Amino acid sequence: MLTYMESHPDVGLMMPRILHPNGKTQFLPKLMPSPKMLIQRRLRSVFRTQHETWMTKFEMRSMRDDQISEVGNISGCFSLFRTEALKRCGTYDERFFMYFEDTDLSRRIHQHYKTICFPFVSVYHLYGNAASKSWRMFSIFIYSLCQYFNKWGWFFDKERNQCNAKFLKQLDN
């Protein structure tokens, strides 16, 4: 990954393919989130019929394992940053204790650099999903969600729409 980043100065942030301990892919690179998508994701039992279609799109599940893809949201579980990108865009925003800190930083870096998933390297990640198991963690999730959308815009976010359209278009090629 480091060799790739060094030879591609337009890349500011990248992540490898992330696997569950059983070897199955975790769909952690995602589009830039919208409130609608997060509500649909959380209420999957209500939106049963459309849920898989929405999640396939949001989680970019059609990303190929043999192709580098630009993504809107790089998971904080494993990220490789270009130092210059951090100097230019800043580091983690202190408003986000947990949840959305990686989403916010991905978005800021993407304004100036490419943010990519590099599927030729894999790492294993034990996913805890704490926000669905604890009211305290869920309340932190909701607080961070509100902080994120207060910062970037709730429903009318032209930048998010343009970026997500670009990310999805590359998957069609």
Residues covered by each model-derived region:
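Active-site-adjacent helix/loop segment of glycosyltransferases
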Residues: T103-R107, Q111-N173
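Catalytic donor-sugar/metal-binding loop of nucleotide-sugar-dependent glycosyltransferases
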Residues: S69-E70, C77-S79, T83-F97, T103-Y124
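Short linear elements at protein peripheries
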Residues: L13, T56-L80, Q162-N173
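Short, flexible, basic/aromatic active-site loop/helix in glycosyltransferases
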Residues: P33-V71
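Residues that scaffold the ATP/ADP-binding catalytic core of kinase and kinase-like folds
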Residues: L28, L38-R42, R88-C89, R108, ...
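Conserved donor NDP-sugar-binding/catalytic core segment of glycosyltransferases
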Residues: M1-K30
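Short, hinge-like loop/turn segments at secondary-structure boundaries
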Residues: P29-P35, K133-R136
